[in-house]
Structures are given as structure tokens and as C-alpha cells.
Regions:
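N-terminal amphipathic/basic leader segments beginning at the initiator methionine
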Residues: 1-19
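NAD(P)+-binding Rossmann beta1-loop-alpha1 motif at the extreme N-terminus of oxidoreductases
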Residues: 13, 35, 279
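Mg2+-dependent prenyl diphosphate-binding active-site environment of isoprenoid biosynthetic enzymes
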Residues: 22-272
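C-terminal accessory extensions/subdomains outside the catalytic/core fold
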Residues: 272-279
Length: 281
């Protein structure tokens, strides 16, 4: 999934206000630190891949949606790492925002990124509505984080909200940016989110912290269920393979259907720790 330059340019443009002399300097630094340098930018690249697979792309709408979703993702990472949730000391191979700038600025930076996400799609109300749907309650990323505050949780509902929601926003907004009906693309996004969550659960148990760019063993440390604790290690790897096979079948008819399926499977498999590639092939 190529196209990093347009995404980075759009993200920089979304944070242009932080360059103003009126913006508190430490806050401005925290905002940029939260977004740059980024991770793999998987979500915005997925949105763009879906749009390009569909064909008749509105480039401006596509980039706006991709930017908005990545800003929301970055905001969710900043908040997820806070001591009141995971208390993760580092992210993307560097100290977490709250470690580098303090909890107060981390909260404010995450909040500001959410606001900027919706500002990015202001000219595209249909995309804004999709992003809003999957960011809020009861099924969005906020609900996913809120499940961690409950005495008990349903693993499927928890993972669909925390991970699947934003991937559904990606596939639906990507289709919309190509002037297609977004509804048939919702299920695909949820399934991709499921695959990524299973892969992340496997990495959390078996991955190397340095390779992942974030601490491992977080679910066990916080008493949260995951696919490995539920199905066992081998069972989780097998489950991932079954999800990947269903993903390819779930892609709606579009001109670039075959290539899109290959891209999704390749990117998801790449998340499995290197030493497990043979077992997950």
C-alpha cells in the first residue's frame, strides 16, 4: 500500500496551527511528537488502497479521510498509553507522549488530535459521519477503551470496538472517496480489524518489545483477555489464518479486488513476529 508522501503532507498540514507563535511551545511539541515519526500508517494506506481498488477516486476526499483516521489513531495511542489505562512507557520505539511531556500535555494532545481529525474532513460531510460513527459510542474506539473499565467484558465486542471500528471507517470512507456505496465495505473493515487484533495478540505474547516498538505482555499485566489466552498460542495462529482466508472472500466486487486482497493479507501477516512467519504461512 504505497502513498506515504501524501499522507505525511496532509498530517503536517493538519498540525500547521501548532507552528503558530500563539500555540504553547510544549503543547506544539507534544502534538508533533504524537504524530511524527509515524508507525506503518496502515489505516490511511488501507483507506487509499480501497479507494484506488474501487476506481473513480476523488483524491482530495481520499487524503482527507486518510488524514482524519490516522489522527484519530494517533490520539487513541496517546490516550491508551496513559497511566490510567496501559501505562505504557514507550510507543513506536520512543518514550510515550506522557513520559516525554507529562500526563497533562498528553491528555491535551490526544484531545486536540481528535478535534483536528474532524476538521480534516469538514469539507466532506459524508466521510465525517462515517468517521464519527466509528469513533464514538456504542461501537467505536471510545467504547473499546471504555470496556477496559468494566468488571467483565465480552472479548468479541471489546476487540470489534477497540480495533475493528477504525478499520471499518477506513474501508467505508475509502469506498466513499471513490464514489461507491460504503455499506458493503463495513464487514470487510471489521474483519481486517479482527485479523490485526489477533496478530497483535500474538505479538503481545510472543513478540520482542524492540521489534514491536511498544511493551509486550500488556494484556496479561492488566488482566485483559486476548485471542491467545482464549484459544491458546497455536489456536490463535490458526484463527488468524482462517480470518485472512475469509477477508479475501469478503472484498466487495471492484476493479482492483484481487490486488487489494493480496495487499491486505501481506500487511497482516507482516505483523506476526519474524520467528513465526513459517508457522503462520
Amino acid at each position: 500500500m504505497d502513498g506515504e508522501n501524501p499522507i505525511e503532507k496532509a498530517l503536517a498540514g493538519a498540525l500547521i496551527g501548532a507552528n503558530s507563535p500563539d500555540c504553547p511551545p510544549k503543547f506544539a511539541q507534544a502534538l508533533h511528537y504524537s504524530v511524527f515519526p509515524g508507525g506503518a500508517r496502515i489505516r490511511p494506506k488501507l483507506l487509499m488502497a480501497v479507494a484506488n481498488a474501487c476506481g473513480d477516486v476523488d483524491p482530495s476526499a481520499m487524503i482527507a479521510g486518510a488524514c482524519a483516521i490516522e489522527l484519530l489513531h494517533c490520539a487513541s495511542l496517546v490516550h491508551d498509553d496513559l497511566p490510567c489505562f496501559d501505562g505504557a512507557a514507550y510507543r513506536r520505539g520512543k518514550p510515550s507522549v506522557h513520559v516525554a511531556f507529562g500526563e497533562r500535555l498528553a491528555v491535551l494532545a490526544g484531545d486536540a488530535l481528535i478535534v483536528e481529525a474532524f476538521a480534516a474532513t469538514a469539507a466532506y460531510p459524508q466521510i465525517t459521519r462515517i468517521v464519527a460513527k466509528w469513533a464514538s459510542a456504542p461501537h467505536g474506539i471510545c467504547a473499546g477503551q471504555a470496556w477496559e473499565c468494566e468488571d467483565s467484558l465480552n472479548l468479541v465486542n471489546y476487540q470489534r470496538a477497540k480495533t475493528g471500528a477504525l478499520f471499518a471507517a477506513c474501508t467505508m470512507a475509502g469506498a466513499l472517496a471513490a464514489r461507491c456505496d460504503p455499506k458493503p465495505w463495513q464487514n470487510l473493515g471489521m474483519m481486517i480489524g479482527e485479523a490485526f487484533q489477533v496478530a497483535d495478540d500474538i505479538r503481545d505474547v510472543a513478540g520482542i518489545s524492540g521489534e514491536m516498538g511498544k511493551p509486550t505482555g500488556q494484556d496479561a499485566a492488566h488482566g485483559l483477555p486476548n485471542m491467545v489466552s482464549t484459544f491458546g498460542y497455536d489456536g490463535a495462529v490458526q484463527y488468524l489464518e482462517s480470518v485472512l482466508s475469509r477477508i479475501v472472500e469478503a472484498i466487495p466486487e471492484c476493479p482492483g479486488r484481487q490486488e487489494l486482497g493480496q495487499q491486505i493479507v501481506a500487511v497482516t501477516r507482516a505483523m506476526v513476529p519474524k520467528q513465526l512467519h513459517r508457522g503462520a504461512a
